[in-house]
Amino acid sequence: MITLKNVSKWYGHFQVLTDCSTEVKKGEVVVVCGPSGSGKSTLIKTVNGLEPVQQGEITVDGIVVNDKKTDLAKLRSRVGMVFQHFELFPHLSIIENLTLAQVKVLKRDKAPAREKALKLLERVGLSAHANKFPAQLSGGQQQRVAIARALCMDPIAMLFDEPTSALDPEMINEVLDVMVELANEGMTMMVVTHEMGFARKVANRVIFMDEGKIVEDSPKDAFFDDPKSDRAKDFLAKILH
């Protein structure tokens, strides 16, 4: 479903990704973790072309992402992305946030787009807030709206870039619960997160990054119970204290 082969990226002379290779199979949940500045967010943003790469190849469902001929807008309509800071349109109501891309990109009629939006708002527990604006919702509610908005596009995979790191602690679980439900339903997911409880619960594999390299890429039990690298052992000791 998602394949990265020998992916490298530079910002000027600074190399942010070095020879990164991995694969996410259909229905797999892969958690990407590592210290700040390790390249996690950059890696996940290369998957749908938000971050261009200078070397290597990225394919999603057979489409080569970094081929100049690839229609990235079309690809992004099929790969949902949820960001750290929600990225909702502040001037649109919640229901409008959920219907806009369905109508503009997927060319859905307004009535079925609205029906789909309401169904997904109900799924994330927010149907009562359809006519409110983002600023009227808590951070946790806004992030659940962002997940529902991505799901409105019927994505083949979902990418999450630190979806809980901007939230107050008491709001984190309401977002993670939605993500756990998605994982249990078989959604293909790549998740950049420090939430190791979530990783233990639903990840098939864990990728550990440091200094732009994939240091470990292993089944979750192997990663948590028997990490191979000293860097991963050190990271887990700090984060699981």
Swiss-Prot record:
Reaction(s) catalysed by this chain's protein: a polar amino acid(out) + ATP + H2O = a polar amino acid(in) + ADP + phosphate + H(+); L-glutamate(out) + ATP + H2O = L-glutamate(in) + ADP + phosphate + H(+); L-aspartate(out) + ATP + H2O = L-aspartate(in) + ADP + phosphate + H(+)
Residue ranges of every copy of the ABC transporter domain listed in the record: 2-236
Family statement: Belongs to the ABC transporter superfamily.
GO cellular component, one term: ATP-binding cassette (ABC) transporter complex, substrate-binding subunit-containing
Gene designation per UniProt: gltL
A GO term for molecular function: ATP hydrolysis activity
GO biological process: L-aspartate import across plasma membrane; L-glutamate import across plasma membrane
Domain of life of the native organism: Bacteria
Keywords: Amino-acid transport, ATP-binding, Cell inner membrane, Cell membrane, Membrane, Nucleotide-binding, Translocase, Transport
Keyword hit for S-adenosyl-L-methionine: no
Residues given in the record as ATP binding sites: 34-41
Record EC number: 7.4.2.1
Listed name of the protein: Glutamate/aspartate import ATP-binding protein GltL
Stretches assigned to coiled coil: none
InterPro entries cross-referenced by the UniProt entry: AAA+_ATPase, ABC_ATPase_HisP-typ, ABC_transporter-like_ATP-bd, ABC_transporter-like_CS, MetN_ABC_transporter-like, P-loop_NTPase
Subunit and interaction comment: The complex is composed of two ATP-binding proteins (GltL), two transmembrane proteins (GltJ and GltK) and a solute-binding protein (GltI).
Localization (cell): Cell inner membrane
Membrane topology: Peripheral membrane protein
Pfam family, one: ABC_tran
Role, per record: Part of the ABC transporter complex GltIJKL involved in glutamate and aspartate uptake. Probably responsible for energy coupling to the transport system.
